[in-house]
């Protein structure tokens, strides 16, 4: 189980005066970002460390609890590569981008929306957050055009339909978007 922020503070053996100082220093930022939407891009390589993952999720819930409206947008490169290996599919990269045929696109979708997204939503819930996971293809959330024919299904974003995200935020959810 994860250590809560309160337990971390207790383990630090800091005085109440020091705690008050920390909160006082944070107050201008809390006021500045209260009721503001922030987008956090959480990349696949940052997800490798379980400890870092837990800290990021806890921090997002803290932001949400103090009135900031986070939107978590995540990838999952390393887990995608692992799954492709498991099914015997070789990853090929051109200029740092994965060549993505139809079969690879289906595996990517399965890993991002079916596995990683659900794990992150669950972790946010364990820390007291209220999160909903969606995929970039849900409700035409993200529209794209093919970036380079050599890359297959890899695209460049042409439009983001933000309304589904705004609807979730209005209902006090933390949107978790797989891309």
Map each language-model feature to its residues.
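Nucleotide/pyrophosphate-binding catalytic subdomain
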Residues: 1-179
């Amino acid at each position: 189980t994860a250590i809560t922020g309160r337990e971390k503070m207790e383990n630090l053996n800091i005085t109440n005066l020091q705690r008050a100082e920390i909160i006082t220093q944070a107050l201008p930022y809390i006021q500045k970002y209260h009721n503001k939407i922030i987008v956090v891009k959480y990349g696949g390589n940052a997800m490798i460390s379980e400890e870092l993952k837990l800290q990021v999720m806890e921090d997002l819930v803290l932001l949400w609890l103090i009135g900031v409206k986070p939107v978590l947008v995540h990838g999952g490169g390393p887990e995608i590569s692992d799954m492709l290996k498991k099914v015997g599919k070789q990853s090929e990269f051109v200029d740092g981008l994965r060549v993505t045929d139809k079969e690879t696109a289906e595996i990517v979708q399965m890993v991002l929306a079916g596995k990683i997204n659900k794990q992150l939503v669950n972790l946010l819930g364990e820390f007291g957050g209220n999160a909903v996971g969606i995929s970039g293809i849900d409700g035409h959330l993200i529209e794209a055009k093919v970036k380079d024919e050599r890359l297959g299904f890899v695209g460049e974003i042409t439009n983001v339909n933000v309304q589904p995200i705004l609807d979730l935020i209005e209902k006090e959810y933390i949107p978790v978007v797989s891309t």
